[in-house]
């Protein structure tokens, strides 16, 4: 079946849906997170055992954390993206919602593999380790994440309790530093909006998508169809992406963001040389009431 989500997977609350917002089944009038909020609520409410969503920058993991389910974004290319309407092609990945880790493992084992219709799908064999509760892991804790002023105190407190429990069970806790944390969200939004601007250009009322019945002529068809057909958040991101790709700004924004992305990846790879697992909050804040956040920038910081 089909489930509700933010329009073109652009949102962190599922309030940008063309079909109306999804309500968090755990608390009335609260959002479930987004963009895959419908998928999260379907599993959390017991409407289905498992569900799928797309995760570009947290769109599975964030609503999972707000609905008490297990959300997983597999490694890029592990699951085929064939059939997915692209938001940002170099970030998008199909993810899963389940009620337990075992179901997530089973679902991944079924879905993973090469797909001739998706050139980005991985050819590497998927291997699972046998569960061993006696095995001890090196668990990395990023200082800048836990000390960040934007992290909700309730989340910080719960994570500290988890860390203490892990220590008592014999796992090694390793303190790490990620000095580039303030560059994560800006870099993400420069690159994803740029890719969205390109990917959604085909929805012009001629080739794909809504076509304005009032339009007269080709140019007016393009303008009216996109103006009337897209929601406000989608239009906002298309405009931002078009700006960073425009002449005179491409090198200043898009090219620089690609370089920063490489730095961020290299820094992450270095952390995994010292650790087996990184323990981090899924989202900086907890679920909020519908219509509580009006500022798009504040909403972007939920990613």
Enumerate the language-model features and the residues they cover:
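A structural preference for short, hydrophobic beta-strand core positions in alpha/beta folds
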Residues: 1, 173-175
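Short glycine/serine-rich loop segments
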Residues: 2-109
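Short, well-ordered beta-to-alpha junction loops that form the rim of enzyme active sites
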Residues: 3-4, 10, 144, 178, ...
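Charged, often glycine-rich, active-site loop that binds/positions anionic groups
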Residues: 13-20, 186-199
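Glycine-rich, small-residue loops and helix-cap segments
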Residues: 48, 165-168, 173, 195, ...
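A short helix-breaking turn/cap at a secondary-structure junction
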Residues: 73-157, 162, 220-224
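Flexible, acidic loop-helix segments that line cofactor/substrate-binding pockets
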Residues: 118-125, 137-138, 142-145, 176-189, ...
């Amino acid at each position: 079946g089909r489930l509700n989500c933010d329009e073109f997977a652009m949102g962190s609350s599922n309030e940008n849906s063309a079909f109306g917002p999804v309500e968090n089944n755990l608390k009335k009038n609260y959002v479930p997170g987004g963009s895959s909020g419908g998928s999260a609520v379907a599993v959390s409410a017991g409407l289905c055992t498992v569900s799928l969503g797309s995760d570009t920058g947290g769109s599975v993991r964030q609503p999972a954390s707000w609905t008490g389910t297990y959300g997983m974004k597999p490694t890029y290319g592990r699951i085929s993206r064939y059939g997915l309407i692209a938001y940002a092609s170099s970030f998008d990945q199909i993810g899963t919602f389940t009620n337990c880790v075992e179901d997530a493992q089973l679902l991944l084992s079924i879905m993973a593999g090469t797909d001739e219709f998706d050139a980005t799908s991985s050819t590497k064999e998927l291997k699972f380790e046998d569960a061993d509760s006696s095995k001890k892991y090196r668990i990395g804790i990023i200082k800048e994440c836990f000390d960040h002023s934007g992290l909700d105190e309730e989340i910080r407190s719960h994570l500290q309790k988890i860390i203490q429990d892990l220590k008592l069970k014999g796992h090694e806790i390793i303190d790490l530093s990620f000095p580039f944390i303030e560059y994560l969200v800006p870099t993400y939004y420069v690159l994803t909006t740029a890719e969205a601007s390109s990917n959604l250009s085909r929805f012009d009322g001629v080739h794909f998508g809504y076509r304005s019945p009032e339009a007269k002529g080709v140019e007016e068809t393009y303008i009216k169809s996109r103006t009337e057909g897209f929601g406000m958040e989608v239009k906002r991101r298309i405009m931002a992406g078009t700006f960073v790709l425009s002449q005179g700004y491409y090198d200043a924004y898009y090219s620089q963001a690609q370089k920063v992305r490489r730095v961020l990846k290299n820094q992450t790879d270095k952390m995994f040389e010292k650790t087996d697992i990184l323990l981090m909050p899924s989202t900086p804040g907890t679920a909020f009431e519908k219509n509580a956040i009006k500022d798009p920038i504040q909403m972007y910081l939920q990613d």
